[in-house]
């Protein structure tokens, strides 16, 4: 089986952790900081961090147009936490100068969990991932308040004060989660994305 080449946007966030998780899931993972590096990958991960900072750095490194074009051409992209915000068509509580890629028709609320219950761990059952629920970390995370037509809800918080909140979605080749799977030893979500990329090659 051919290993898909998956880039990790290496401007901020858990780049090393995502790279290691993708490699463990059978992908050829590499950092992406320049348009030329983006040209070499079959899929892209946008890691967590601070979404307004990522937005500025994407412009500074001249990656906005190339990423927009690759998304339009069908390249699979996975965004975690701030990466989810970068993929959303609408962001609540964001900054006015903040710009994402608007690939997924959804409304997300920035730092939604942060104001109420800060960082926490929770089980999330995800459609398409077999076995026990994923036990994942939320770090001042967003949640999804609305999804458009064609957006599949993959996971919600199972229990606690945020029970029922949407935290994982997919639209076509675009995947987004509120949480950080790279900070656990469970590689099933990265394997799911690697399979998505493999199918798109």
From Swiss-Prot:
**Which is an annotated GO molecular function term of this record?**
glutaminase activity
Kindly state which keywords UniProt assigns to this record, in alphabetical order: Glutamine amidotransferase, Hydrolase, Lyase, Pyridoxal phosphate
Gene Ontology BP terms: glutamine catabolic process; pyridoxal phosphate biosynthetic process; pyridoxine metabolic process
Task: Please give the GO cellular component terms listed in this UniProt entry.
Answer: cytosol; glutaminase complex
Q: Active-site residues?
A: 81, 180, 182
Coiled-coil stretches are none
Pathway as given in its UniProt record: Cofactor biosynthesis; pyridoxal 5'-phosphate biosynthesis
Q: Which reaction does it catalyse?
A: aldehydo-D-ribose 5-phosphate + D-glyceraldehyde 3-phosphate + L-glutamine = pyridoxal 5'-phosphate + L-glutamate + phosphate + 3 H2O + H(+); L-glutamine + H2O = L-glutamate + NH4(+)
UniProt xrefs under CDD domains: GATase1_PB
InterPro entries for the chain: Class_I_gatase-like, PdxT/SNO, PdxT/SNO_CS
Binding of L-glutamine, residues:
49-51, 110, 139-140
As recorded in UniProt, its EC number(s) are 4.3.3.6, 3.5.1.2
What function does the entry list? Catalyzes the hydrolysis of glutamine to glutamate and ammonia as part of the biosynthesis of pyridoxal 5'-phosphate. The resulting ammonia molecule is channeled to the active site of PdxS.
Q: How does it assemble?
A: In the presence of PdxS, forms a dodecamer of heterodimers. Only shows activity in the heterodimer.
**NCBIfam families cross-referenced by the UniProt entry:** PLP_synth_Pdx2
Q: Which family does it belong to?
A: Belongs to the glutaminase PdxT/SNO family.
Q: What protein name does the entry list?
A: Pyridoxal 5'-phosphate synthase subunit PdxT
Q: Which organism is it from?
A: Salinispora tropica (strain ATCC BAA-916 / DSM 44818 / JCM 13857 / NBRC 105044 / CNB-440)
């Amino acid at each position: 089986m051919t290993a898909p080449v998956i880039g990790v946007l290496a401007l901020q966030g858990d780049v090393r952790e995502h790279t290691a998780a993708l490699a463990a899931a059978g992908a050829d993972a590499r950092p992406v900081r320049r348009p030329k590096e983006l040209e070499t990958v079959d899929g892209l991960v946008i890691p967590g961090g601070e979404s307004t900072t990522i937005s500025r750095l994407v412009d500074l490194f001249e990656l906005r147009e190339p990423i927009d074009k690759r998304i339009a051409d069908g390249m699979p992209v996975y965004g975690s936490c701030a990466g989810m915000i970068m993929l959303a068509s609408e962001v609540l509580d964001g900054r006015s100068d903040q710009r994402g890629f608007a690939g997924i028709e959804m409304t997300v609320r920035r730092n939604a969990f942060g104001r109420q219950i800060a960082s926490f761990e929770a089980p999330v059952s995800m459609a398409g991932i077999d076995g026990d629920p994923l036990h994942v970390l939320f770090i001042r995370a967003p949640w999804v308040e609305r999804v458009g037509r064609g957006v599949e809800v993959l996971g919600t918080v199972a229990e606690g004060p945020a029970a029922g909140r949407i935290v994982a979605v997919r639209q076509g080749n675009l995947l987004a989660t509120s949480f950080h799977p790279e900070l656990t030893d469970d590689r099933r979500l990265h394997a799911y994305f690697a399979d998505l990329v493999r199918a798109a090659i």
